[in-house]
């Protein structure tokens, strides 16, 4: 089990020989207009073009700082598969990503990448990419179950009883990626 943090919420996880990239954001600015919106303080520690082959991308929700259009399109062009919460597939289709390259999951639904089981689990948050589309897509955390190790990625979340339920169903976890702030 290995994990490399690339800043903010972007993490590369390697488990059972499978490389998973969580909420990849490699753009300098994540905004519909380049002069507004969240901006990186520091460049990522690796260029997007220097990443190793990624088996799957996991997206927690549709906020601009978690679902980066430019990064997503680049990875999709490389043939990368995406696991996303319900509703986010509409963005991927709009960005010309083939439906065969992604799966949308509801809370408690899962799929496998190799021998690794990925479960879309609850989070206490909200969604939306503008002032006019709040809560039209699902937000999530993710439980990642390998043959011997387990990872929990919280996504953006507040504390709630969902942590106990996730831990009861899928824990204990060997690595927890908890978003703070």
Q: What label would you give each PLM region?
A:
Residues 1, 6, 10-62, 69-74, ...:
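Pre-active-site segment of Zn-dependent metallo-hydrolases
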Residues 24, 121, 180:
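Glycine-rich, N-terminal phosphate-binding loop of Rossmann-like dinucleotide-binding domains
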Residues 1, 84-149:
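Metallo-beta-lactamase
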Residues 18-20, 56, 116, 149-151, ...:
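Structural motif
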Residues 70, 125-181:
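Active-site-proximal loop/helix segments of hydrolase catalytic cores
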Residues 77-80:
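A short helix->loop->beta-strand "cap" motif at the edges of active sites that frequently abuts
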